[in-house]
Swiss-Prot record:
Stated family: Belongs to the ClpX chaperone family. HslU subfamily.
Subunit text: A double ring-shaped homohexamer of HslV is capped on each side by a ring-shaped HslU homohexamer. The assembly of the HslU/HslV complex is dependent on binding of ATP.
Gene Ontology terms describing biological process: protein unfolding; proteolysis involved in protein catabolic process
Protein name (record): ATP-dependent protease ATPase subunit HslU
Keywords, in A-Z order: ATP-binding, Chaperone, Cytoplasm, Nucleotide-binding, Stress response
Organism from which the protein derives: Staphylococcus aureus (strain NCTC 8325 / PS 47)
Length: 467
């Protein structure tokens, strides 16, 4: 697996995160150092490697300030498998809900997809060539061979009445005639020139055996997956366009061209050495009243999570995986509880603490304009597809930021997510009318913003429901 991104210096990682995330420099620095330490560990001898584990991170801050986005972008920068889970979805072993080991199995699934996608990209040209050959044969088929019933050694005992069920000649063809060869040559040329992309062709695709009803509980999920793998995959015929058929066939051939066992082993190692698990809402399982029944259950979840953070061997459908060197990032607002309300053993497993700042008006302005594909740029691009040009003035952007900040103060503080609701509401009429106003130019000014939002933003009751 190509993990060139892990060789980035902390400054380079922070620089890449700055392309997408505004502010929160302390959090960016700490995750960048954690990533760099992984690279440093990879350069050590085997004995030293085993002694050094990642320093897990606890992010503390209100919703919408960038906790998840920092972790997600960080994983993307280095090509590491990443999953986000919510601590509240887990329950103690023996209760209804997801068991904590499922987060590791989910991470391995992500890792397998990453590794196989990269390996498939290396054989893509060969797989596409095979797919094109198959398409030519499908578009200009030869005569099918008749099923052979003459070579069964038992037929002489039964007067030739026993057909040979052991052979399936369904897909075998007679040798192509000269006429068919000529037609195929012409079709191949047209395929290469892209002239047949919209033509329809019938192909056989594997049908997912589906879930087994009797194994629907989470505890039996792995058993269900194993059963699905053992069950024969039924093939069904579909009529699709040539361009779609090529993708389906190429993907199937790419699967055949890569070594599945080797890919699975590589994925397990990648998950072990580079995996990142983001545990959100960890504050919701913190306990500040140790007498209530609910808090006893929350403590149980914490104690179930603890062995995975300390290092456990988890069985997955691809093999066993050790969690000792995975990086865990816990996150929560900690409005009601405090990090010290977590059980002491779990607190000790998150040695790096970082507090994320609440967002100011200036932060909102930067979020609207600075990232690589900021919200303003996204809406401009979407409306441009309808040939409607939208221009936001600097004053209008500042006004939007002020309204978002004020609504957060007056109602629930949902951080940068408030900008999505504000922009959607402000541009609702324009988005609806855009198809009927081609070549229009719309200037978004402070007056435009106030006309669309002021009556709502100044009414706290309306803000709570609409924005």
């Amino acid at each position: 697996m190509d993990t060139a991104g892990i060789r980035l210096t902390p400054k380079e990682i922070v620089s890449k995160l700055n392309e997408y995330i505004v502010g929160q420099n302390d959090a960016k620095r700490k995750v960048a150092i954690a990533l760099r330490n992984r690279y440093r560990r990879s350069l050590l001898d085997e004995e030293s490697k085993q002694e050094i584990s990642p320093k897990n991170i606890l992010m503390i801050g209100p919703t919408g300030v960038g906790k998840t986005e920092i972790a997600r972008r960080m994983a993307k920068v280095v090509g590491a498998p990443f999953i986000k889970v919510e601590a509240t979805k887990f329950t103690e072993v023996g209760y209804v809900g997801r068991d904590v080991e499922s987060m590791v199995r989910d991470l391995v699934d992500v890792s397998v997809r990453l590794v196989k996608a990269q390996k498939k990209s290396l054989v893509q040209d060969e797989a596409t060539a095979k797919a094109n050959e198959k398409l030519v044969k499908l578009l200009v088929p030869s005569m099918k061979k008749k099923a052979s019933q003459t070579n069964n050694p038992l037929e002489s005992l039964f007067g030739g009445a026993i057909p040979n069920f052991g052979q399936n000649n369904e897909d075998e063809e007679e040798p192509p005639t000269e006429e068919i060869k000529t037609k195929r040559s012409e079709i191949k040329r047209q395929l290469e020139e892209g002239k047949l992309e919209k033509e329809k062709v019938r192909i056989k695709v594997e049908q997912d055996p589906g879930a087994l009803g009797m194994l629907g509980t989470n505890q039996n999920q792995q058993m269900q997956e194993m059963m699905n793998q053992l069950m024969p995959k039924k093939k069904v015929e579909r009529e699709v366009a040539v361009e779609t058929a090529r993708k389906i066939l190429a993907d199937s051939y790419a699967d055949e061209l890569i070594d599945q066992e080797s890919a699975n082993q590589e994925a397990l190692e990648l998950a072990e050495q580079m995996g990142i698990i983001f545990i959100d809402e960890i504050d919701k399982v913190a306990t500040n009243n140790h007498n209530s029944g609910q808090d006893v259950s929350r403590q149980g979840v914490q104690r179930d999570i603890l062995p995975i953070l300390e290092g456990s061997v988890i069985q997955t459908k691809y093999g066993t995986v050790n969690t000792e060197h995975m990086l865990f990032i816990g996150a929560g607002a900690f409005h009601v509880s405090k990090p010290s309300d977590l059980i002491p053993e779990l607190q000790g497993r998150f040695p790096i603490r970082v507090e994320l700042d609440s967002l100011s008006v200036e932060d909102f302005v930067r979020i609207l304009t600075e990232p690589k594909l900021s919200l303003i740029k996204q809406y401009e691009a979407l409306l441009q597809t309808e040939e409607v040009t939208v221009n936001f003035t600097d004053e209008a952007i500042t006004r939007l930021a002020e309204i978002a900040y004020q609504v957060n103060q007056d109602t629930d503080n949902i951080g940068a997510r408030r900008l999505h609701t504000i922009l959607e509401k402000m541009l609702e009429d324009l988005s609806f009318e855009a198809p009927s106003m081609p070549n229009a130019v719309v200037d978004i000014t402070p007056q435009y913003v106030d006309d669309k939002l002021k009556s709502i933003s100044t009414n706290k009751d309306l803000s709570a429901f609409i924005l």
